[in-house]
Design a protein with these regions (language model features):
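Thiamine diphosphate
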Residues: 1-179
């Protein structure tokens, strides 16, 4: 693996040291995606494995955040996150407004642009919806991690931000091995 992957591992380890964080999603506690391997130095007690139920996962993430936790919720590809758009756009993004700023949940969402090498998974797993989501969301910042040096500061910002916003961090699957 390359420096891009190493920085993701470092960022995940940093996030795991905060008592409020919990890593949730498909293949966070069991091997299944490249994102799973970035949790190699994260305690199993910080991981909550979920079934393939993307909308439920986003709803659970919102609920955990409303209870004071900071879920780091994994959607290995944008194409999976599309299935949670209702919860994302109509709930998580609007909680601050609907509660008259009484609630400001903090959720860190990891997603990725699928890798094409060494095996191309075809169009279902290669989407990059970064710009579309930026247009849809008001209280959720979307950050695409184009460069290795962007990774740690972006995840640190997501954890430490005080502006009441959640964060979607978009990784490049091909960069895990190439950068």
């Amino acid at each position: 693996m390359g420096a891009y992957f190493d920085e993701l591992c470092r960022a995940m380890e940093y996030l795991s040291q905060d008592s409020r964080t919990m890593f949730i999603g498909q293949a966070v506690a069991v091997t299944g995606t490249a994102m799973t391997t970035t949790l190699k130095n994260v305690s199993d007690e910080k991981k909550l494995e979920l079934p393939v139920a993307e909308e439920m996962q986003m709803g659970l993430s919102t609920g955990m955040a409303l209870a004071g936790l900071i879920p780091v919720t994994f959607y290995p590809r944008w194409n999976f996150l599309l299935l949670a758009v209702n919860q994302l756009v109509n709930h998580l993004d609007k909680v601050k407004h609907m509660s008259r700023e009484g609630f400001q949940p903090k959720v860190i969402i990891r997603t990725g642009i699928g890798s094409t090498r060494p095996l191309n998974p075809q169009c279902q797993h290669l989407g990059d919806f970064t710009e579309a989501f930026r247009l849809m969301l008001t209280n959720i910042e979307v950050i695409r991690l184009d460069e290795t040096e962007d990774i740690f500061p972006a995840y640190k910002k997501a954890l430490e931000r005080t502006d009441g916003k959640c964060t979607i961090l978009v990784e490049w699957g091909d960069y895990y091995n190439e950068k």
